[in-house]
């Protein structure tokens, strides 16, 4: 037995369930992706001047290691 009948068609909700609805689900607007930040230009020519002294020391240390032994 039905629980309740509406008197008019306007009393019914427009969408009763998303699963039973014939309308497609609205898609959210696509957000633009962030661009990568531009890299800073190196000012000095020497490693100690531009802050790359530690990076160069690591490269030299890796080259001097046991990798050269025969």
Swiss-Prot record:
Keywords: Antibiotic, Antimicrobial, DNA-binding, Nucleus, Secreted. It comes from the Eukaryota. Residues 46-57 have a biased composition (Basic and acidic residues). GO terms for biological process: defense response to Gram-negative bacterium; defense response to Gram-positive bacterium. GO terms for cellular component: chromatin; extracellular region; nucleus. The record marks 67-68 as: Cleavage. GO terms for molecular function: double-stranded DNA binding; nucleic acid binding; nucleosomal DNA binding. The keyword Nucleus applies. Residues 1-70 are annotated as: Disordered. It is found in: Nucleus. The keyword Nucleus applies. Residues 30-45 have a biased composition (Basic residues). Non-histone protein that probably binds to the inner side of nucleosomal DNA, altering the association between the DNA and the nucleosome octamer. Belongs to the HMGN family. This is Non-histone chromosomal protein H6. It comes from Oncorhynchus mykiss (Rainbow trout).
């Amino acid at each position: 037995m039905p629980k309740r009948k509406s008197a008019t068609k306007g009393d019914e909700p427009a969408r009763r369930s998303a699963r039973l609805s014939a309308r497609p689900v609205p898609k959210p607007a696509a957000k633009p992706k962030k661009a990568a930040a531009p890299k800073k230009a190196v000012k000095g020519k020497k490693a100690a001047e531009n802050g790359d002294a530690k990076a160069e020391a690591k490269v030299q240390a890796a080259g001097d290691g046991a990798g050269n032994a025969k």
